[in-house]
Curated annotation (Swiss-Prot):
Gene3D superfamilies: Nucleoprotein (1.10.3610.10), Rhabdovirus nucleocapsid protein like domain (1.10.3570.10). Encapsidates the genome in a ratio of one protein N per nine ribonucleotides, protecting it from nucleases. If expressed without protein P it binds non-specifically RNA and therefore can bind it's own mRNA. Interaction with protein P abolishes any non-specific RNA binding, and prevents phosphorylation. The soluble N-P complex encapsidates specifically the genomic RNA, with protein N protecting the genome like a pearl necklace. The encapsidated genomic RNA is termed the nucleocapsid (NC) and serves as template for viral transcription and replication. It comes from Rabies virus (strain China/MRV) (RABV). InterPro entries: Rhabdo_ncapsid, Rhabdovirus_ncapsid_C, Rhabdovirus_ncapsid_N, Rhabdovirus_nucleoprotein-like. Phosphorylated by host CK2. Unphosphorylated protein N seems to have a better affinity for leader viral promoter encapsidation. Phosphorylation of protein N in ribonucleocapsid may stabilize the interaction with protein P, thereby playing an important role in viral transcription/replication. The modification Phosphoserine is found at S389. Homomultimerizes to form the nucleocapsid. Binds to viral genomic RNA. In nucleocapsid, binds protein P and thereby positions the polymerase on the template. Protein P acts as a chaperone on free protein N to prevent it from aggregation before encapsidating genomic RNA. Keywords: Capsid protein, Helical capsid protein, Host cytoplasm, Phosphoprotein, Ribonucleoprotein, RNA-binding, Superantigen, Viral nucleoprotein, Virion. It comes from the Viruses. This is Nucleoprotein.
Amino acid sequence: MDADKIVFKVNNQVVSLKPEIIVDQYEYKYPAIKDLKKPCITLGKAPDLNKAYKSVLSGMNAAKLDPDDVCSYLAAAMQFFEGTCPEDWTSYGILIARKGDRITPNPLVEIKRTDVEGNWALTGGMELTRDPTVSEHASLVGLLLSLYRLSKISGQNTGNYKTNIADRIEQIFETAPFVKIVEHHTLMTTHKMCANWSTIPNFRFLAGTYDMFFSRIEHLYSAIRVGTVVTAYEDCSGLVSFTGFIKQINLTAREAILYFFHKNFEEEIRRMFEPGQETAVPHSYFIHFRSLGLSGKSPYSSNAVGHVFNLIHFVGCYMGQVRSLNATVIAACAPHEMSVLGGYLGEEFFGKGTFERRFFRDEKELQEYEAAELTKSDVALADDGTVNSDDEDYFSGETRSPEAVYTRIMMNGGRLKRSHIRRYVSVSSNHQARPNSFAEFLNKTYSNDS
């Protein structure tokens, strides 16, 4: 008997078959490098840098950039950015550089070259006859890499947000040590012609390489990071949110997770803390794993750990944090239940609201204030109607312990208290809610209950 088969009847005929499903080609992929090989891309033949500069600049002025030529130029231009490595630099067992070595972005990765010549057209006319200076090369590299940042800005940002960022970036790359090489608004005009460049693997790879280099190596032209900084922890919003959350509540990751009272957290916590990843290693390839092509589907994104993401931002909303109110709810990950847990944790860790006395004349005054607040909360618990007098002993100890918080939720039937709902409504109703945001969810869900 085949253990994989099932037997059943169709029109009195016995059928035996093995149920098979489509193999998921998009499984989460962890970024750890196990073969000691650096991240790698293949580009066309290395160009003459002066010719390439003139071609790419003329393409920028005409808003007609060839992505292959741009990538080939960016890889070749790495030679202009040499700095000293401050410490031995290793990641996933790969030695990138030794302390004191003079390095460019090149040793971080492997760039293979073919014999295929680039296009190197002069679409915008031939304006520059002399050879460009290093600062002109640096300015062009900075402007090109900024196209990555601009293409990552989502359509949710309203008004002139993107134009304002493009203008500020242009100002950076026309101020010393850089030099003005394009007219005002050229960057935004060019971006419109290549708005999806963040999806081009080689361009994304080079943006991540430059960012990894400038985040570690002090350099005259470090401001180039203004265009590449979005490659750091890209598609890691779940893990980044969790990290920010534990810093806020001043607990270790282990202590914080004890408050995650929901069965759907189990898979996500396991996913987020898979062993063998360099999540806590500074300047690791992990930080830029998405742009360097080490993972096709991030296990650390908001969608990959949606329950954790929802909970953290509901707690953030309870605190009135704009970032949380603006974040997008992961609708498939129990937002109602997460909002309940978020209300209780928000109250436990952040008090009844934003306004509290935080500063005192001396230690004695601080202790007196804390003692008075403790008495107040004991009275509130006794009068709440949700706590029986039998439970007073239970609450007189560590009221913030996971056991105490869990018991409180259970005693309220897994529902929010009126005070929680009032808090949620007050923070969300004063906020201009974006579509599908946490603010909109709280407004729609709780505004009638307050």
